[in-house]
Amino acid sequence: MHALIDLVKYPLITDKATRLLELNQYTFLTSRVATKTDIKNAIEFLFNVKVISINTCLLPLKRKRLGKFVGSKPRYKKAVVTLEKNNTINLFSEN
């Protein structure tokens, strides 16, 4: 069993993720070994919200070069979390 805090790494802020905020869907980068049930429990525990559904995808490995050396960026799992209508997550602090 993994610690719930370690499963959700950080929210992804992209153009598509910003559009999904209007539909009450939030995008997070998660641990590769996390299951949908683990992610649901972690989001509900960390943010005190009710999760309706979770869509995940394991993004492919990307090869990178630096001169003659070839390396790779690590794979990661992206999770799109849909919340109930009356629940929100405050990702951006308002000062």
Curated annotation (Swiss-Prot):
Annotated GO biological process: translation
SUPFAM superfamilies, per the entry: Ribosomal proteins S24e, L23 and L15e
Keywords: Chloroplast, Plastid, Ribonucleoprotein, Ribosomal protein, RNA-binding, rRNA-binding
Any GO MF annotation of the entry: structural constituent of ribosome
Ribosomal protein among keywords: yes
Record carries keyword Lyase: no
Subcellular location field: Plastid, Chloroplast
InterPro entries for the chain: Nucleotide-bd_a/b_plait_sf, Ribosomal_uL23-like, Ribosomal_uL23/eL15/eS24_sf, Ribosomal_uL23_CS
Pfam family, one: Ribosomal_L23
Transmembrane residue ranges: none
GO CC list: chloroplast; ribonucleoprotein complex; ribosome
Domain of life: Eukaryota
Function: Binds to 23S rRNA.
Family stated for the protein in its record: Belongs to the universal ribosomal protein uL23 family.
Quaternary structure note: Part of the 50S ribosomal subunit.
Protein name: Large ribosomal subunit protein uL23c
Organism: Guillardia theta (Cryptophyte)
Gene coding for it: rpl23
